[in-house]
């Protein structure tokens, strides 16, 4: 059975999130909640976005979505190639500059028995290209893939 589930299976679903904001951009505060309630009134403010305030921000949420989507897509591709990862860990770093997300860097570390470094890097590059969140984003996306023994 082919397992490119995230890109080839004819699926349609929706997910929802809500944002609420009160006040001005600088002084106001808001919350973000997700349908799954994983985020349930998570705090959002100028300080959480542009300084070190307690809470979350859109760029952090993009990084979380991208790292999760990419890592899951990679797992499907590895499985399709006959490999099962012992561990895949991806850190997404979102760069915000002059009002725009200018770069997202994916730093992948993976432990996958019996795969060559070349095959691992090739599969990771394919996952980066076909991950639905990668396709959604209109920015430069770079990748460092490290196979750990």
What are the functions of these language-model segments?
Residues 2-64, 71-149:
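Extended beta-strand/beta-hairpin segments
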């Amino acid at each position: 059975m082919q397992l490119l589930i995230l890109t080839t299976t004819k699926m349609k679903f929706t997910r929802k999130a809500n944002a609420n904001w009160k006040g001005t951009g600088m002084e106001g505060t808001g919350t973000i909640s997700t349908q799954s309630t994983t985020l349930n009134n998570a705090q959002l403010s100028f300080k959480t976005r542009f300084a070190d305030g307690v809470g979350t921000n859109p760029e952090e949420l993009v990084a979380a979505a991208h790292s999760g989507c990419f890592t899951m897509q990679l797992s499907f591709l590895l499985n399709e190639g006959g490999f099962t990862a012992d561990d895949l860990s991806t850190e997404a770093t979102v760069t915000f500059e002059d009002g725009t997300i200018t770069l997202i860097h994916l730093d992948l570390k993976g432990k996958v028995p019996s795969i060559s470094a070349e095959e691992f890097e090739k599969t990771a590059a394919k996952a980066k290209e076909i991950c639905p969140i990668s396709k959604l984003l209109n920015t430069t996306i770079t990748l460092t893939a490290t196979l750990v023994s």
